Amino acid sequence: MVKEFDQDPQADVWILLDAQASVHYSRPDDIVIPPADRFWLWKNRYEFSLPTDTFEYSVSVAASIASYFLRQGLAVGMMSYGQMSIALPAERGERQQTKILENLAFLKSEGELPMLGLVESQYSHIPRGSIVVMVTPSNHETIALAADALHLRRMKPVIVLIDGVSFGSENGVEYLSLTLTERQFPVSVVKKGMDLRQALERGFIEEPARSQVVN
C-alpha cells in the first residue's frame, strides 16, 4: 500500500474510524486502559499491551497512522462518530497530533452510525485526491460500498480491517478483504496479538509510532 502514498506525497490523509457499537467485540473481564493513560502512552510512544477489544486496536491503529504521517509533514484529518462526533480538519504539525490523540483517547464505541453512513455524511468535506483510511472491524459488504463511493469521488480509499475472529468474535473479515482486493483497493488486516507496527508495515506505512503488542 505504500505506493498509494508515494504517488502523491503531498495528498491529505483522512482517517475514518468506525465507532459503531454493534460491530465491535471485547472480552468483559479484560483490562481497561483509562483515557488519560492511553493518551500519555501514545504521545510518548511507549509500548503497552492492548486488551482483547477490537475498538482498542482500532483507535491504536488510527493513532499510529496519524502520528506517522504527521511526522512526515503531511496534513492529517480525522472523523468518527461514537458517543460524540469527531470531525477534525486536515492540518499539519504537533498540535494536530495532540488534538487527534486526545480525541481518540476519550472516544468510545457507542455510536449508531455505520462506516457507510459516516462516509456519505462527510465525503463532501474531504478534498478530491485525498487518501482516506477507513479503520473498522466490520465485515459487512457496505464497507466495499463505502470504498466505491470514495473512489467515485476521486479519493483514494485504503482499508484497515480488524479481524474479529482473532478476538473471539464470529465476525471474520477474510471474505471482505478478498472482495476489496478484487476491486483493487489497498487492504491491511490486523489480528489480535499482532505487533501493530509489523501489521501496518505489511500494509502501507514503514515506521509507525512504536506499536502495542498483546501477549
Spans of features found by a protein language model:
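Exposed, interaction-prone extracellular/peripheral surfaces
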Residues: 1-215
